[in-house]
Regions:
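Solvent-exposed, membrane-proximal periplasmic/extracellular interface segments of envelope transport
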Residues: 59-72, 685-687, 692-707
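Extracytoplasmic/periplasmic
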Residues: 657-670
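A general secondary-structure signal for short beta-strands and their flanking turns/coil
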Residues: 2, 15, 44, 429, ...
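A carboxyl-terminal module marker
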Residues: 668, 672-693, 732
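Accessory, non-ATPase domains that flank or precede helicase/AAA+ motor cores in DNA-metabolism machines
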Residues: 1-364, 376-392, 676, 708-715, ...
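A general secondary-structure junction signal
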Residues: 53-55, 105, 185-187, 436-438, ...
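Inter-lobe coupling/hinge segments of SF2-like helicase ATPases
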Residues: 199-206, 210, 214, 223-660, ...
Length: 738
């Protein structure tokens, strides 16, 4: 028997297997996915590899094939299902097998496990008394003191013995040699769930919530494992639906994974789950120490926990019997990996569930176009919650035209309506959230007099300003010189739109000096528990106003917040991205959902230069269907996902001329060798930021209805690029439907 083994090293260009012979004694035990020790290279140094294929045919002369040394012991290994998942990632997202394996195995480097040592008495009371008498006669004070303590308490922590009883390691060793006691060790798992106290009263479900739970549970009990899109308006109680269905799955001896979009959600989310399921819950996030992450991996693997909460990486928790995967706020961009492999957690979750026989719940007040499109086409099941749980109603929304504010002479960041409502809420001792809809480095260019945004005439996305003043489209490469006069109204108030949270904070303190202000952005949340500290302060009423970027509108529930101010809705609306309208609608709807979630009524003020835009109007009305109908028509017209599939090929190099030639070669290869009906290949164009740290980047887009066609193209390209000397100093990456 022969095994195809992939080496446990990370190198983008290394994506091939090595064939090894399987020793007779391992033929009956070796399995796909096992970690094995192998001799490698001319010096036969021992390294670790993974079995990714088994067969009886030798690919090389038999005398040249080396033997596997043995199965790796004592390390976290890639089990068969993880390797199958890695192969699926490779095929669907254009990465190497090594990169896929390192993604699906959460912890690769074994961290030294913390251990707790205790001294245990292993003789009966009569024997202990005899030894005690002997020690008294011999004046062996330390031994007498230790045995006396063990008679009273048969198990004592070793640290107490050394610190409180002043007993040395030699005395403990002597007790072991004499057969009086033994030292036992147990792994100490670091518990990342902190500050969870008290009990939470179980909430009575309303009729819509009950129907949602009953639907999912009935299908589950019948073995009909589906993917559900739980479309619930903000405050409709989606989390209670998650809790009920998870409890049902756990009662059947299976496990659940709950994905959250980013670390800021853990403060409230973990408490709600921990109150229901106790220490069976754990969390995983990027700010945890390596040791903490390793502990959670082991706890899941050994069955000590049943619910894992975390961002997209928590999806790869090694549960043995996964029954349910919940993706809360499924529309969030954070579920898409920005590093290779550029997978989407939603797609991977559905694949894992299909393989494991599990259900998936995708929850959102503003579903992604992909999920809603799938529901409309019958690929997943739609469940709707269209009313708020409890007594909270939807907030009143004002759309303020900033062009009119400018005409009235108001050049501050606060419209008259927002300033008026802020004064009112501060007087009532109610809380306010101010949201700065900020994205990216390069801003869009617009006219402050009439609101016109400079767009690409070919792609219907905003042009991005470069350092030299040129405006460029990063989808097709269209370029135009710097614009100083508005082509629509002739005004010279044409500029890039940029703002910052610090500037907003300064303006708030100047306008409302008596207000207690907190700012939540990347600068103020550095450190392990930065998010939780700020959210806790605000939740406890220690601030009147919370200012922040996207992280403040992601699912937080603050009952005393009755006013949400969106300072500049246009900042995301005109980013150079075909998803700009969708992201704006989602952010504005989520922002509006933060106000008036309890008994108090809420207000939302949306400030914008384009008050008539359909995404802003739909968000103000909380009308998802109206938004979807207009947006899907635009996607179909332009051939963007989910109507079509879009693959972005990214090339980068320190050699600009080499990069230009390489990008031209890729474009020509696709045009000449990938003759699929309906295929479009656009580019190459410069990347949004063409040069970073002396590395130049170009982009090529490939569109087609069939996802498998794009998979086939990136595999064909890989075959021709890997080992090609012309691409030795060019990095090529793929991003599908990013």
């Amino acid at each position: 028997m022969y095994a195809d083994v992939i080496i446990d090293i990370s190198h983008e260009q290394l994506d091939k297997t090595f064939q090894y012979a399987v020793p007779d004694e391992l033929v009956d035990v070796i399995e796909l996915g096992m970690s094995v020790d192998i001799p490698f290279g001319a010096g036969n140094r021992q390294i670790t590899g993974y079995v990714v294929g088994l067969g009886d045919k030798a690919a090389y002369p038999v005398e040249k094939i080396k033997y596997i040394t043995g199965i790796t012991e004592g390390k976290v290994t890639a089990v068969s299902r993880m390797l199958k998942l890695a192969a699926w990632l490779k095929h669907n997202y254009g990465c190497t097998m090594n990169q896929a394996i390192k993604t699906v195995i959460p912890v690769k480097d074994k961290v030294k496990q913390k251990e707790k040592h205790s001294v245990n008495l292993i003789i009966d009371a009569a024997q202990a008394q005899k030894y005690l008498d002997t020690f008294a006669k011999k004046n062996a004070k330390a031994r007498y003191r230790l045995l006396e303590a063990l008679i009273k308490e048969p198990v004592i922590d070793e640290s107490i013995i050394k610190s409180k009883l002043n007993i040395t390691a030699q005395t403990v060793k002597a007790f072991e040699d004499m057969g009086i006691a033994e030292v036992r060790s147990e792994d100490m798992y670091r518990n990342p769930v902190r500050n969870v106290t008290g009990e939470r009263k179980r909430i009575e479900l309303n009729e819509q919530q009950k129907n949602a739970v009953d639907t999912i549970i009935a299908d589950y009990d019948n073995g009909d494992y589906k993917t559900y899109l739980l479309h619930g308006v903000t405050g409709s109680g989606k989390t209670e639906v998650y809790l009920e269905t998870i409890e049902h799955v756990l009662n059947h001896g299976r496990q659940a994974i709950v994905l959250i979009p980013e670390i800021a959600l853990t403060f409230q989310t973990v408490q709600r789950f921990y109150h229901r399921f106790g220490d069976k819950v754990s969390i995983m996030n990027s700010r945890m120490s390596k040791g903490e992450r390793y502990d959670q991996f082991l706890r899941a693997q050994r069955g000590d926990i049943s619910v894992m909460i975390g961002p997209r990486s928590a999806l790869f928790t090694p549960f043995s019997n996964i029954g349910l995967i919940v993706i809360d706020e499924e529309h969030e961009g954070a579920y898409k990996s920005e590093t290779v492999p550029r997978y989407h957690a939603r797609e991977v979750a559905c694949h894992i569930a299909k393989e494991a026989g599990a259900s998936v719940i995708l929850g959102s007040a503003t579903p992604s176009m992909e999920s809603y499109y799938a529901a409309m086409n019958g690929h997943i099941q739609l469940i709707t919650l269209d009313s708020r749980a409890g007594s909270g109603g939807l907030p009143a929304v004002d759309i303020v035209d900033l062009r009119e504010e400018l005409r009235l002479g108001n050049r501050t960041i606060f419209s008259n309506r927002l300033r008026e409502l802020m004064s009112d809420r501060l007087a009532k001792h109610e809380q306010i959230m101010l949201f700065l809809n900020k994205r990216g480095v390069a801003g869009f260019i617009s006219c402050r007099s009439c609101g016109k945004v400079m767009k690409c005439p070919h792609c219907d996305v905003s042009l991005t300003e470069h350092a030299d003043g040129r405006l460029m489209c990063h989808y097709c490469g269209y370029t135009t010189p710097k614009i100083t006069v508005c082509p629509s109204c002739g005004s010279r108030y044409v500029s890039g739109f940029r703002a910052g949270t610090e500037g907003v904070e300064a303006q708030v303190k100047k306008t409302f000096p008596q207000a207690r202000v907190l700012r939540m952005d990347m600068d103020t949340t550095r450190g392990k528990d930065g998010h939780e500290k700020i959210l806790s302060e605000f939740a406890n009423g220690n601030a009147d106003i919370l200012i922040g970027t996207q992280m403040i509108v992601k699912g937080h529930d603050f009952p005393n917040v009755t006013l949400m101010g969106v300072l500049a809705a246009d900042m995301s609306l005109y980013s150079s991205d075909y998803r700009a309208s969708e992201r704006t609608f989602q952010l504005l709807t989520q922002a509006a959902g933060r106000a008036g979630r309890a008994e108090k009524s809420g207000n939302v003020v949306i400030q914008t230069y384009t008050p008539e835009h359909f995404s802003i109007v739909s968000a103000a009305n909380q009308d998802y269907n109206a938004f979807y109908e207009q947006e899907i028509a635009y996607r179909k017209l332009c051939g963007y996902p989910p109507a079509d599939n879009l693959m972005k090929i990214m090339l980068s190099s320190q050699d600009e001329m080499l990069l230009t030639k390489g990008a031209a070669w890729v474009k020509a290869f696709v045009d000449n060798n990938c003759k699929y009906k309906g295929l479009m290949c656009i580019g190459p164009a410069d990347a949004p930021i063409y040069k970073i740290k002396d590395v130049y980047s170009k982009i090529i887009y490939v569109k087609h209805k069939d996802r498998e066609v794009l998979n086939s193209i990136h595999e064909k390209l890989d075959v021709n690029i890997v080992g090609n000397q012309a691409f030795k100093n060019i990095n090529v990456q793929y991003d599908i439907n990013g």
